[in-house]
Amino acid sequence: MTRWAAFAGITLAVLSLLLVLARLSQSAVTAAPVAPEDRRRLDGLDDGAGHLEAPTAPAPKRTPAEATLGPGPEPTTAALLANVAVSHGLLAALLLGGIWLADVPASALGITSAPLSTGLPAVAVGVAVGTAIALANTLAAGLAEALGTDPSERLRELLAPESPGGWALLLVVVLPVIAGFEELLFRAALVGGFAAGFGVSPWLLAVPSSVAFAAGHGAQGRLGVLVTGLLGFALAAAFVLTDSLLVVVVAHYAVNAVEFVAVEGLELRPFG
């Protein structure tokens, strides 16, 4: 017999832990010493330019307390990728353990023997949905960057690797872990599981699930949170319509992979 109350408690506990970790790690993105647009402007100057001369450089306006308690050195890309992969992996293990202990049926989480649930058709639908969302997302990010308001630019720059090995780690390990865990939590558990266990419409559950999904991406700024909320609802709609966890995992991965490869890897700028 499924213990739905226990499942709900574990799911909400995992969600709370994720939001707390997201809040704590947000400082690594928002406390950057140099803004991305300033970095690009400075990189375009000659090595001997006067902006590097110490006598004319303005002194940092920091009190002793701020110097002691303020953010330390900017974390490396490898450290950030490892942190994301490990934290999401541990939370996924905790959630999967709760699902097993509560004896939640796989069908409630969008996992059945139907081809559209776990077969190649599900992969194809996920690729199609993810590509469509990724195209719109990349165009919107390009326009926002051209206007100097791209909310995700700072986060992408921190996570974008600078070596083939780093890209392999990002695309083969980190992004799949992110997509798998976040879809298991925000779509399969909070939408599918809660709908099956408590008789609530999955369309109704898609709203708070998308709000929670957006809240976990505060590092992208207010505009980024809004965009992420819309993305979350689109993925929730895909989950409800297909009743497939695999579809939304593939779609989520496609969105993230296309954005990183197109914007950071290939440096495509649709609007200059």
Task: Indicate where each model-derived feature is located.
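N-terminal, membrane-interfacial amphipathic/helix-forming hydrophobic leader that caps
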Residues: 1-120, 124, 260-272
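Hydrophobic alpha-helical segments
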Residues: 6, 84, 123, 127-129, ...
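Transmembrane helix-loop-helix hairpins at the membrane interface
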Residues: 13-18, 154-272
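Short helix-terminus and kink motifs of transmembrane alpha helices
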Residues: 19-31, 134-142, 187-188, 192, ...
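Structural signal for membrane-spanning alpha-helices in multi-pass inner-membrane proteins
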Residues: 22, 95-100, 129, 133, ...
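Generic detector of short, locally flexible boundary/turn motifs and exposed helical patches
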Residues: 71-76, 139-144, 152, 156, ...
